[in-house]
C-alpha cells in the first residue's frame, strides 16, 4: 500500500492479458481498493476499500465488498464502518482484515466483526498472512515490524529490525514467512527509499531474516502470493504485476494499472485478484494451466 497519492484515476485502461483478464462490474463499490482475498468455501473475492480516496484516517468510512468467482459484484458493502482496511486473509470461517485499529476478526457467515486485535505501537499496519495452524502475521511498513498473533490470543511484536526494509506483502511458505518490501526509507516515515524493495524470508521458528535471490532489488513492492514454485508480486509505483521464478528471474506479467496493491490468489482456479487503487477496479487474471 502506498498512502501519499492525491488523486484517483477513472480512465478505463487497456489491459495486457495472460490467459485472459476480466474487469469486475463497473459499479461504484470500490474507493481506493487495497486488498483482494479469495475465500474458497464461499467462492467469493473480498476486496477492502480505504474509503475517502487515499485517506488512512480512523474515520469509519472504509468497507469490504464481496464479488463472485467471475468478478460479479455480490455485496457492495459486505462489512462497513471500518478504518481504512488493507490486507486480508482467512482461516476457520473467519476473515481477518487489517485496519487502523488493529486486526479485525470477522465471522464470514454472520458478516459481523467479533473482535479487534490491537497491534501495540504499530505505525502503519498493512498486510496479513496466516499459517496452517491459524497463526497470523501482520506487517508494519513504516515501523519495520512484524507482529504475530497466535490462535485466540493477542498480538505480540515478533520481529523488529531495519533489515525488514519497509515490510509490505506477506506470504507463508512452509517454515518461512516471505516478505515483499517497499525498500529502505531515506528517513523515518518517508516513502522515498534509498533503493527499490526486494524479497526476504523470515524463519518461523526463530525470526531470522534471509535476503532472497542474491539481494536483487525488484521494485516498490506491495502484494505477494505464491503458486506452485513461482511468486507473484505487485510494484505499486509502476502499476506492474511481476513473476519471480525459483531462480530469481523477474518478468512482467501485466503493466499499466496504477497503484496495484495487495493481490490475492485462487490457487485452484489459477486466478489472481488485483486491486487497482488509483483506478478503483478489481482485475481478475487467469494465469492458465501452462503459465511458467
Model-derived regions, located:
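Bacterial N-terminal signal peptides that target proteins for export
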Residues: 1-11
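Short loop/turn segments immediately following the C-termini of beta-strands
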Residues: 50-52, 100, 141, 182-184, ...
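Beta-rich, blade/repeat-based domains predominating
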Residues: 29-43, 50-55, 60-61, 79-95, ...
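A short loop-to-beta-strand structural motif that recurs across blades of beta-propeller domains
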Residues: 60-65, 102-104, 145-148, 198-200, ...
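Asp-box/WD-like beta-propeller blade repeats and closely related beta-sheet repeat scaffolds
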Residues: 102-103, 108-133, 139
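Short loop/turn segments that connect beta-strands within beta-propeller blades
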Residues: 67-71, 107-112, 149-154, 203-207, ...
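A short beta-strand motif characteristic of beta-propeller blades
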Residues: 25-27, 72-79, 112-118, 154-160, ...
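Bacterial N-terminal signal peptides
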Residues: 10-18
Amino acid at each position: 500500500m502506498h498512502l501519499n497519492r492525491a488523486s484517483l484515476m477513472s480512465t478505463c485502461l487497456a489491459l495486457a492479458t495472460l490467459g485472459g483478464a476480466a474487469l469486475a462490474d463497473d459499479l461504484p463499490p470500490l474507493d481506493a481498493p487495497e486488498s483482494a482475498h479469495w475465500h474458497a468455501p464461499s467462492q467469493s473475492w473480498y476486496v477492502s476499500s480505504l474509503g475517502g480516496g487515499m485517506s488512512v484516517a480512523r474515520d469509519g468510512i472504509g468497507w469490504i465488498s464481496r464479488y463472485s468467482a467471475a468478478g460479479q459484484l455480490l455485496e457492495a458493502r459486505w462489512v462497513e464502518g471500518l478504518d481504512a482496511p488493507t490486507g486480508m486473509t482467512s482461516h476457520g470461517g473467519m476473515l481477518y482484515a487489517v485496519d487502523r485499529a488493529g486486526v479485525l476478526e470477522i465471522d464470514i457467515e454472520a458478516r459481523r466483526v467479533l473482535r479487534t486485535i490491537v497491534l501495540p505501537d504499530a505505525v502503519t499496519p498493512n498486510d496479513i498472512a496466516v499459517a496452517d495452524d491459524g497463526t497470523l502475521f501482520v506487517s508494519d511498513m513504516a515501523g519495520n515490524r512484524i507482529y504475530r498473533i497466535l490462535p485466540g490470543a493477542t498480538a505480540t511484536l515478533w520481529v523488529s529490525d531495519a533489515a525488514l526494509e519497509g515490510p509490505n506483502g506477506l506470504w507463508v511458505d512452509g517454515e518461512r514467512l516471505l516478505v515483499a518490501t517497499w525498500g529502505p526509507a531515506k528517513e523515518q516515515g518517508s516513502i522515498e527509499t534509498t533503493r527499490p524493495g526486494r524479497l526476504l524470508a523470515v524463519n518461523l521458528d526463530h525470526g531470522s531474516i534471509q535476503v532472497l535471490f542474491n539481494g536483487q532489488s525488484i521494485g516498490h513492492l506491495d502484494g505477494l502470493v505464491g503458486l506452485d514454485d513461482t511468486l507473484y508480486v505487485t510494484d505499486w509505483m509502476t502499476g506492474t504485476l511481476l513473476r519471480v521464478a525459483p531462480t530469481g528471474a523477474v518478468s512482467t506479467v501485466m503493466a499499466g494499472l496504477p497503484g496495484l496493491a495487495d493481490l490475492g490468489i485462487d490457487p485452484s482456479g489459477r486466478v489472481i485478484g488485483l486491486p487497482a487503487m488509483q483506478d478503483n477496479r478489481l482485475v481478475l487474471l487467469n494465469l492458465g494451466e501452462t503459465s511458467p
